[in-house]
Amino acid sequence: MIAALHARGALPFRWVTGDEHFGNTPMLLDQIAAAKLSYFMEIPHNVRFWPERPLTAVPAATGKKGAPFTRVRLAPGASVAIRVDALAVALPRGAWQVAQIQDGSKGPLVAEVAFVRAVAVRDGLPGPDVWIVCRRALDAPQELKAYVCNATADTPRETLVWLLGLRWPIEQAIKEGKEELGLDQYEVRGWRGWHHHTAMTLLAQHFLMRLSSRLGGLPRR
């Protein structure tokens, strides 16, 4: 769906964000990257990465019998991929910086963030180079959130911080769609009816958001 929407060009976009369920789906991430798009996904703490790209090699034949090895494997002595939470714990204190993530309903949301270039794991082998973005609350540094992003190495840190704050407005938009436009008030038995209801509701919400932006903000109920 993402690739088809992008190819159609009807709704220009560059970034795809999601929660840790999507962030822990390598096939989805690779398909997004193959479509020349960038992803920024939350990931579980047990997802593993290499801080540096490990050595790989095709094993040498061990005897005269049998077919030679053809598949690349980790070279002997190659480093082991580590969990993202272990990677975050190992960061020096100077790697963390205070940043304003977004303007929330209760004021600015400020957190400590750190940015690390790492190598993703794909079928036990090194995959793409990615950003690991770590975030922790100022008053609860043990509560870690981690994100993976395939943006280029020269991506400004400000862009990665901006991406950290995108989920709140998306969640707020879904909440408003439910409360004000009946996004979740459907009584259908099949996919087509649900799809039509959802599409028309989101279209109406898009119209209202454009109108609100044009008029400088509409009063809320």
Predicted regions: what they are:
Residues 1-45, 55:
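Polybasic low-complexity intrinsically disordered regions
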Residues 16-24, 39, 147, 168-177, ...:
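Short, conserved catalytic/metal-binding motifs centered on acidic residues
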Residues 27, 149, 156-164, 179-196, ...:
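Short, solvent-exposed helix-loop connector elements
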Residues 157, 170, 196-200, 204:
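Short runs of predominantly hydrophobic/aromatic residues within well-ordered alpha helices
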